[in-house]
Amino acid sequence: RSTKISDNSPSSGIVIRWNDCEQTIDGFGIAQAGWAKELFAFKNRKQVMDKMFGNDGLRLNILRGEIFPHYWENKEDKDFNLNDDINIELCDSDFNNKSDDLLRRGQLWLTLEAKNKYHINKLVFSTWSAPAWMKSNGKVSNGKLKPECYQDFANYLAAFYKAYKSKGITPYAISPSNEPGYAAPWNSSLWTADEMGKFITSNLGPTFQKENIPAKIIFGENPLWSVVMPQLKMVSSKDFTDTILQDYPEIKKFNLIAAGHGYSLSPDIMPIKVDKEYLKTPIIPFDAAEKAHIPVWITEISDVTPLDTSIQDGLKWAVTFHNYLTKANVNAIIWWGGAM
């Protein structure tokens, strides 16, 4: 139906197609993850939470956290530190520390607040790195998961689910790897599509089934949505998810979410001069996931440039979100980060 806005307005119209059904929208959210301690220590943290999740705020319905590598610090350690005190007075000197302990407490407080006060039920958690003792280099940055620790890692993720559920904060989805193609200097772990396909089909998926864990398994989550330049395929989410679904068709029997991140490339970061056309990251569908009726989420997107609160920047992001919804057919969008 076409409707004229007013007698004085330019000739325009809005057409509503009631019977054109597109993808289901699972929601919109923010990631806090490694920034949980900053929000936990902020004196106006409750006002910030209201702005993000409250009825008078953005009314977001997804929160993305991290499965930290410092929960199980050795093979005998099975503690997720969920009995730590989170009711610390904001004037407490503990908030001056930048410790793993404060990060764990911060995420626990944030997740409980999101669930209990704002009734957020889409709580998703990504893993930047497995515990160091499971890694090829014995560190939480770079390296790979040792093949002999694949089942240990699957057990770790299952135990995390059960531990958080015991606190009334049931994870909706779990990702075994954040940005598997990027060896970041912070918590990180490299995976090929073949390694991830094997791990999910042989270890994580069967473990979740055996333990009756209904959480969805997120896979993909590379820094770029898609690429034009073949040499960049290792950081392309579309290539990563397409390869897994093609080479491991049995993976489709599990409860999955195919995901990607929406960062862009600048010629300035390339070691050699590259034409801008080759650095494009097209916003296109994940065809293999769509064909298999697997939801597609963008689990991280942001801007690496300085903060810009202008309407011009706001409109730029409105167009970007619109393109992901209408061109890539995503089911959810998560912004990095909620409060930094």
Explain the meaning of each model-derived region.
Residues 24-32, 60-67, 122-127, 172-176, ...:
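Structural recognition of the beta-strand scaffold that forms the well-ordered cores
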Residues 132-244, 264-283, 288:
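Active-site cleft segment of glycoside hydrolase catalytic domains centered on the general acid/base Glu
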Residues 98-104, 109, 214-217, 252-306, ...:
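Glycoside hydrolase catalytic-domain groove-lining segments
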Residues 11-171, 192-194, 202:
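N-terminal catalytic cores of secreted or lumenal carbohydrate-active enzymes
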Residues 298-340:
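Aromatic/acidic polysaccharide-binding cleft in carbohydrate-active enzymes
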Residues 33-37, 67-72, 129-133, 177-183, ...:
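Solvent-exposed loop/turn segments at secondary-structure junctions
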Residues 1-7:
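Bacterial Sec-dependent signal peptides at the C-terminal "C-region" and cleavage site
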Residues 41-55, 153-163, 229-249, 314-323:
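Short, acidic/polar
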